[in-house]
Amino acid sequence: MQPERAQQVVDILRGWGVAAHVAKASAFRHGVRVVIDWKTEAVWDTDGAAGLEAQVLGDGRLVGFVPPIPGSEREDITAEQQAHLIARADYDLT
């Protein structure tokens, strides 16, 4: 995800009350970090692959994975559509 797009998605999510931040995986890879609870977060789309998927981290350790969301790989997907998919994601860790 380009840094500008990541910031757009974060801004939309924050407007909806979601605790979101830009995640910088490297100098050229950015994504979206969503706080799930006080020790768990999801890091979205920092791998550069098509589609939205997330690694779920608890205390900094991988505890789950959200597989690629169908339809999120479209090239014409908007920032608002990406934010909507992230906001509705299932983080079931049971």
Segments and roles (model prediction):
Residues 1-38:
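Negatively charged, low-complexity tracts enriched in Asp/Glu with abundant Ser/Thr
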Residues 2, 16, 50, 79, ...:
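Generic signature of intrinsically disordered, low-complexity, basic-rich segments
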Residues 6-9, 64-94:
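Ampiphathic alpha-helical segments that act as solvent-exposed interaction surfaces
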Residues 22, 26, 31-33, 45-47, ...:
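Generic detector of ordered, mature protein regions
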Residues 40-77:
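Intrinsically disordered, low-complexity regulatory segments enriched in Ser/Thr/Pro
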